[in-house]
Amino acid sequence: MANNKLAVIGGSGLYDVEEFTKREFLKIDTPWGKPSDEILKTNYNNKEVFFLPRHGRGHFISPSKINFKANIDALKQSGVTDIVSVSAVGSLKADLPPGKFVIIDQFIDRTFARNKTFFEDEIVAHVSMAHPTSNGLMDACEESIKKEKIDYQRGGTYVVMEGPQFSTLAESNLYRSWNADVIGMTNMPEAKLAREAEIRYASVSMVTDYDCWHPEHENVDVQQVIKVLLGNAAKAKNMIKNLIDNFEKHIDPKDPTNNCLDVAIITAPEKRTQKTKDKLKTVAGRVLKK
């Protein structure tokens, strides 16, 4: 399993860990443009790990403007096989209070201004998103969270909204009527693109607020989100260190993500131009070179 490499996508503070002493910042170009920022390559307990701040260092990229395709392509170029997303979310349920972690297993994609596929020009593919997260990585996340005695829930549906504005009360109540658990702005199309690139994906969401539906709590604002995130910072960093140590032992060699493109590409071989195959070399080269 020596070829498995973990990347964490999240806030820039997540890699501010004392033990990460050997650091290299990678500038990577992709056919889709530049990723959100330089990718940090570091080592922990002799294991290589990568960190990418999806909003850029200093949080200057709006959710709708994140270059998700470049981020995923750049991580794949770096040899990444597994991605764990760490993000702030609002709670849509009373039993998911601020401070609780949720290991996501489903998404409802409500975004509308983002490019959501690598396969949009001459080569068409339809990957399955029935189960958008990888069970093995979820197991690794759960073990890492338990070790820190963090209050958490395994399994939950994440509504991904376009943003950058927060929800209206009507929207928040609509999502609650769908029995969704949390709401945020960042995990789509990230999870879809990771699947298209055959990278295993898991999502750990940190609840920071009750959105705007709860009659006994203030409506969400940025200062409230930051306050809870800072309170969770030490726990999140320790969780990540645990993940680096344990994720490989949970990898499922039969994970459907590993070879999902084998049954996804529908375009006839004679219609696949070399120009497009070259563009997709990183994310789909395994199947397109056959």
Q: Where on the chain are the PLM-derived regions?
A:
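Zn-dependent metallopeptidase/amidohydrolase metal-coordination segment
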Residues: 185-223
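Short acidic/polar active-site loop segments enriched in Thr and Asp
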Residues: 81-82, 181, 200
